[in-house]
Amino acid sequence: MIEATKRLLRELEVFGENNDGYYNIPPDTGTFLHILVRISGAKNILEIGTSNGYSTIWLAEAVKHNKGKVTTIEIADHKIAHAKENFKRAKLEDTISLIKGDAVRVIPKLDGKFDFMFIDAVKEDYIKYLKLAYSKLNSNALITADNAIMFEKLMKDYLKYVREHKGLKSVLIPIGSGLELSLKIG
């Protein structure tokens, strides 16, 4: 990762801490996601919840090494504007496709298959996002869902679903605010 991108990420960390509407993942979660993408060889990433693009930059920095792309979905116009500016500053515009809309409506319209999915949006809707995207995930795709410890009660249906689903193997990673990591085995 180039120094300018590291500086941008640090700037976005401070911005996120000072602006409640921008809930960025912690840096250790970003690093963990980056490592997962690199070692898995993921080439097509689906991100639900772009916010200001902080997590997207972590994902895009990793997937560009795999010669891949991030498709990210965000509904809020003001967040989209910030994210686009940040992608340009990170020189990652060609690696990221940002789609405006409600993920519940956008996911069914997506073409192609994904190797990696990161969910960090409306907690109660995580299960909807996964069910809608499931057929678009390749075998051995990784699904990561943020806030599995911090918002465990809001995510209880999602957590029960991924932990009991016959086509998934799932584990809680106690990093940041908790990351539920699932592998699509079927």
List PLM regions with ranges.
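A short alpha-helical cap/connector motif
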Residues: 1-116, 123-144, 148-186
